[in-house]
Amino acid sequence: DIRCRIEGLASYYAAKNASPEGLARLRHIMDLQEFYFEKRDAEHLREMDDQFHDVICDMSGHAVISDTLVPLHRKTRRYRKASIADASRTAQVVKEHRAIFDAIAAGDADRAAALTTEHTIHAKKSMIERMNNHG
C-alpha cells in the first residue's frame, strides 16, 4: 500500500516537473518496451519495466521518493520478473505504462498519479497471485 502511494507521488511530480529530456528518455523506454513485447523478450521487458519506473523517480525531482522506491523495486524484482513472464499481464503492463506516459507528457499530474497507483495495485495483485501459486 505504501509503495502504491509513493509510486503515484513519483508520477505526480514527474508530470509537474517533466522536461523535454525526461520525456524523451521515457518515450524511448516505452518504444523499446513495445518492441520487446512484440518479440516476446521477457528479460528485456523486465529491464524496461525497471527503467520506466526509475526514470519516473528521477523525473519527480524528489530524492526521498527515489531513496524509498529503489530498495522496494529491488525487493520485488523476482516477483515482477515472474509477473512479466505472463503474456496477459505483460500486455496490460505495456498498456498501463503507455497511459501513464501519456498523462505525464500531458502534464496531467492527478491522472498520472491515479494511473500509476492503479498500475501498482494491479502489479501487487499479480505478484501476490504468483507467490501463492509458485512460492
Give a label for each model feature.
Residues 104-107:
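Short acidic-aromatic low-complexity motifs
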Residues 2-5, 9, 16-82, 95-101, ...:
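Conserved amphipathic alpha-helical segments that form helical-bundle/coiled-coil interaction surfaces
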Residues 85-89:
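Solvent-exposed loop and edge beta-strand segments that line ligand/cofactor-binding
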Residues 121-131:
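Short arginine-rich
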